[in-house]
């Protein structure tokens, strides 16, 4: 949005409609000229192919709707084949593993050169997907409700000197600037689209929201 590539609410025409202006080069263009090795792992919400934008290695996660499948992803701009997918594939782990691989190889083969690594995880983005074993770790943590959780976290931040202010109030009228009735219907009666007080939720909503937060934490 800062370079008017993406949609700009309230501005006629809506920005560059997905095309980056010529006057907005990526930082990798300058770094490569100065001898940097450039690596990319994860999202690529930029027009053009990764390697054509002055990166040397890339793991491009296009399958953002399923954290447990590599279908549609690209390795160095080439479609990733199903037979290459490791057992128990999970997008976040695969992205981190690719980053580690790039930096390990850099230290072995290009130790004399500086590097830049653009690491962009899909998580925590909808859909909320995480390994079941990790979700279990957080299963009951959020049943206390978001009001109590935010109070506890705020108190801890004040204790360590990170904040010197008061806890903000809930703004129950603030939510997405769009409605999603189809999604609400699909997700069921446990879903809400406004940050209301925890004690205003039904038992079903509390369980549903606590589960969502547990999965979010596990991501």
Where are these predicted regions, by residue range?
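Formylglycine-dependent sulfatase
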Residues: 1-219
